[in-house]
C-alpha cells in the first residue's frame, strides 16, 4: 500500500463533531453532546501538525454501496475527517456486544458480568482491519498513528503488518486488569500481540501499566525491560493502586 499525506492520524470510534443540517438542509458540523473532554482534547492536537486525519465510523444501510467519506474540516485547524461505513449489525456486534458485554466487565474486573455468548470475533476483526487499512492509506511515510481505546485493540497489529514504517501509539481510556482476569478473554493472545506492535502504549496510572506488562509477559512471553521509579505525583500514601516502580518497555 502506498503512503498517504497525513503526518498524524487519529483512530477513534466517534467523529470529532456531530453531523447536522442547517435550515436550508445543508450539512453542518456541531459539537458533540457528550460531556467528556476526550474529543475536544484530541481535536486540538491538529493545531500542532501540518496535515492530520481523524478516522471514525458512520452508520449506513448497505455498505456495499458506500465508500469511505472524506471531509476537509477547519476547526480548530485544518484536518481531514474519514468516515468508514458500517451497517447496524457490525456496529451492534463490534461495539455494543463484543466491546461492552465481553471487554468492559473484564477491564473493570467484574468477571461475573462477562458474557461471551453473543460475541462475533470475525466482525470485530473485520472492523478493526478496516480502521487499520484506512489509517495506512492516509498516513505519510514515517507518520504517527494514534489509536484510541479497547474497541480498536487489533488495529495496531494490522497497521504494523501493512506499514512497518509508521510510528504507532495506543491509549487505553479504561483500567487494565490483572493478568488473571485478563486471561479470561478467549482472544487474549491476539489482543496482546497486537498491542505489542505499538511503539508506545499509554495507560492512566502506573498500576495499569504494570498489569499490562504482567499480562504480556505471562500470556505471550514478552520480555520485561528495566523498571524505573514512578513520579511522586502518582504515589499517594495509602492508595491501593499505587506502584513504586513501573516497567519502561517490553
Roles of regions detected by a PLM:
Residues 1-250:
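Catalytic cores of carbohydrate-active enzymes across secretory and cytosolic contexts
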Amino acid at each position: 500500500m502506498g503512503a498517504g499525506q497525513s503526518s498524524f492520524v487519529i483512530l477513534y470510534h466517534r467523529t470529532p463533531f456531530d453531523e447536522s443540517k442547517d435550515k436550508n438542509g445543508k450539512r453542518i458540523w456541531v459539537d458533540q453532546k457528550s460531556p467528556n473532554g476526550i474529543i475536544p482534547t484530541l481535536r486540538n492536537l491538529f493545531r500542532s501538525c501540518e496535515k492530520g486525519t481523524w478516522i471514525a465510523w458512520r452508520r449506513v444501510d448497505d455498505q456495499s454501496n458506500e465508500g469511505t467519506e472524506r471531509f476537509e474540516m477547519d476547526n480548530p485547524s485544518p484536518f481531514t475527517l474519514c468516515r468508514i461505513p458500517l451497517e447496524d449489525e457490525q456496529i451492534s456486534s463490534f461495539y455494543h456486544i463484543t466491546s461492552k458485554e465481553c471487554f468492559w466487565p473484564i477491564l473493570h474486573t467484574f468477571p461475573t458480568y462477562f458474557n461471551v455468548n453473543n460475541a462475533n470475533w470475525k466482525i470485530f476483526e473485520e472492523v478493526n482491519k478496516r480502521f487499520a487499512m484506512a489509517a495506512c492509506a492516509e498516513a505519510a511515510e514515517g507518520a504517527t498513528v494514534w489509536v484510541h481505546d479497547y474497541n480498536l485493540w487489533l488495529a495496531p497489529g494490522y497497521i504494523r503488518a501493512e506499514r512497518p514504517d509508521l510510528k504507532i501509539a495506543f491509549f487505553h481510556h479504561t483500567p487494565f486488569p490483572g493478568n488473571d482476569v485478563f486471561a479470561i478473554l478467549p482472544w487474549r493472545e491476539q489482543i496482546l500481540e497486537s498491542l505489542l506492535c505499538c511503539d508506545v502504549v499509554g495507560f492512566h496510572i502506573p498500576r495499569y501499566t504494570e498489569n499490562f506488562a504482567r499480562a504480556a509477559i505471562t500470556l505471550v512471553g514478552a520480555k520485561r525491560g528495566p523498571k524505573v521509579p514512578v513520579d511522586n505525583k502518582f504515589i499517594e500514601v495509602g492508595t491501593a493502586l499505587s506502584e513504586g516502580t513501573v516497567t519502561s518497555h517490553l
